[in-house]
Structure formats: structure tokens, C-alpha cells
């Protein structure tokens, strides 16, 4: 009996390991003061599948906490990461004179963003710490104000936060800009027991991070994150300011991924990391913004992007689909239709919906639960196949539930870190797809090859033409 119990426990352990093939190396909460280098560092961290940004808080420094909040929300909204929670320092202490360049810098569309009713930093941090069981890195791109408030007011902060990662000037953290924003908080935090990793900026002797070669290379990277930073350098004001080219807070993003590019010196719980390989750092910046920080697949290294690899009818649309919607949607679409054993419109809708939900929360696969109201009757239920491939939420992982006991609809509820949203295919699109399928079924019948040829043709059309950012209604539930 004892041997049987031990065997059962070992099997459970093995199954647990296989249910999550890999997790991000870093779960982070970021505190920012709204500097231009903060925008670039945050964008790099958003780009990497090896980092999970749980939330972002804002404090005074380069900008007021409230203006920094507006900048952060505009960036997240423009990248379709609306579900990342953002807080601000509602106390409003330690206000400095704002930097005009930081205030002028565009992070995203600021229309409709009001910091007046923004949640307080502490409520954001407390909620995330209670929801996420993995140890967290608290990344400070500005002052120590928020970190100290959290340490003093959130009992689990010191237990759940494994390290403070702090951006510092090239000469070190003492008397640097971030240190001086709130000197009292800086001194108090350096005396507490959570390990400190202080990451210095690139030195003047090492040259600019953003050389002409790097800026040119950024323009060729086909991700929204690289495009965001590339667009910064298309602005005449940005190009005319010397600070634009320095490697400052971006070093935190590089250090988290590639610490070997830095010289690390430790003194007790405080370690300082100094950039040591400028060219390696530039190459790593490109790699991070490409999202090439982990292997995403389990069996194949990469799916071919060469149109010639695919059948003639889809061949002309390959480049356009990848260019418009990204490699993740393309890969998920290919795999979903192979799983589905035919090109299906609702399967592609499921792919697009799953990618959109992951975008919203900025998650990887296997990270949220999904409840589908598409039922188990084709063609609507075909949506579930696309959903599984694009999100990793499968019945085998215990992450997907398909409801058949209610009114069926192209709608799915996603829950992540105690937050829930509902995505629904817009009625006019759902009705058009359903009407087309009914019509060709009525004319040709399911047993006709012509029926499946027309379904295939329509699926390619919808895959190419339907933008996942425009076809779904998103309703926050929790």
C-alpha cells in the first residue's frame, strides 16, 4: 500500500511537471516615474515571453505620478495590453519639477485616460501579491517611494518579493537621480532585508546604446514593441535630445535576461551590476524586442514562414497574415487547422480570440482558465479547437470548460489572477459567417467536396481580413 501511494504521488508530480513545460523566469511588478527610458525598458519587458509583467505602479520623478500613470496606460492600451493593472501614488508626495522632454514624449494615445480615479499603488501591489504564488521581482525604474510604502503597509511584501531590481546612474546608486528623488526612502530601503540588485547605466566611454546601426535594425524588426521604440526615433524632438540615445533603464531589461553581459559585485544583500559588453547588449536588445528569449514550441523549433511551404490557395496570403497579425497568430492558426483537420472559419475565430485574450492580459500559454459558451455542436464549437491551440487552455490541462447547459454563443470568459473578462464575436460578424455556412450547406450539403472547398476559401479570406483588435467585444467582469 505504501509503495502504491508513493508511486501515485510520483505520477502526480510528473503530470504536474508536464502540464506546464516552462514558466517565465521573471514575474515582475514595475514602478516607474515616467521617464523616456522607462518607456523603452517597459516595452522591452513586455516584448519578452520570459518575463511576466503582473502590474505597473507610478510614482513622482521625471513626471508626476499622475502624468506617469497616463503615459503607462497609453502605452499598454496602444499595445493591446489593457488588462495589465496600473496604479499611481494617490498621496502625491515627493513631487519634483517635471521634465519637459518626458512630458512631451508620446507613449501612446492618451485620449480618455483619467488619473483622478486611478487605483492606489498599494491596492494594486497587494492584490497581485495575494494572487500570484511565484516569487516576484520588484523593478524600480525611479525612486524607492512605492517600494517603501509597500514594505511598511503590505505584510506579505517582504515574503513574496524575492528581490528589488533598481536602475542607477553609471557612477552607482548613491546620490544618483533615482536615489535623490526620495532620499529618505532610498536610505530606508537599503537597510531592509530584501536582496537588492542595482543595475547601472552604460557609461559615456561605452558609447550610446542606440547607435545608427541599432536604430536601423529596430526598424526591420516586425513586432509592435520594436515598432514602438523605432517610432520614438522618428520624432524630431527625440532625435535632437542626447539623452534619447543613452542606455539607462533599458539595462534592467537586458540584465534580467543576460546577466553575463554585466560585471556583478556583491556586498551583503546589495549587488551592483555594471554593463561590460556594449555590443552584446545591443544585440540582446534586438533579441528581446523580437521576443526571442525562450523557445516557444515543444517539438518543432520554428514553423516555416516561406509562402512556398504552404498550399497554393493560402500561399498568397501568408506574408500578409504574418505582417498584419504577427507570427503567433500565424503559427496558432496553422496548428489549429491541422488539429481540426480542415480549414474552418470558427476555428480561426477561436485562434484570434485566444491571442486577443493573451494580449489583453499579456500572458503566455497555459496561464488562464477559459469557459467557452460555443458548446459542442459544429460549426460554432469548432471555435474551441482554435482557442485551445492559441491559449494552451485545454481540457487536458484542466483549463478549458465547454458549457452546453445555456444559450450558446461565440463567447468565452477568461480568468487570470482573479480578473475576468468576456470576449464575444461581434454579432454582425457571427451572423455573416453563420449565414454563409448555412447557405452553402443548404446548396451543396456536408458530404460535398464543393462545400468544404468553399469553407476553405472563406476561412482563408477571414483569416486574412479580420483584425482581432476589431472583431471582438471585450467586457471586464472582475
PLM region descriptions:
Residues 2-8:
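Sec-dependent signal peptide recognition
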Residues 9-18:
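Hydrophobic h-region of N-terminal signal peptides that target proteins for export
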Residues 14-15, 45, 49, 358:
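Hydrophobic alpha-helical membrane context
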Residues 20-306, 394-395, 477:
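N-terminal acidic, glycine/proline-rich low-complexity segments
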Residues 33, 59-63, 320, 340-345:
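A short N-terminal beta->alpha junction/helix N-cap motif
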Residues 245-254, 342-352:
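Active-site nucleophilic cysteine motif
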Residues 293-343, 349-478:
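Non-transmembrane, aqueous-exposed alpha-helical and coiled segments at domain scale
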